[in-house]
Amino acid sequence: MIYSIKIDPKDNVAVVTDEVKAGDTVFYKNPDGSKTEIKAITPVTVYHKIAICDISRGDKVVKYGEHIGEASCDIKAGEHVHTHNVESVREDLKI
């Protein structure tokens, strides 16, 4: 059993806590305490993100409740989410 971390209800990705192979089942806990499972369709490196729903090209990628990038292509639920399919939207820091 492989677990992942989903912090915020707005998240559309979860962070896996172990190496994931295509076909593995990954679980995450919902805010109400229930568990949801997702079938990995690509390998996912430990501590990387897995899509927990389909994300369309141009949609926001949300991790820990924060907008961390935009999908550079359509991403299917169960796919590895990383720099190969997400464009950064970093903003200049004002200090």
Predicted regions and their residues:
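N-terminal small-residue-enriched
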Residues: 1-95
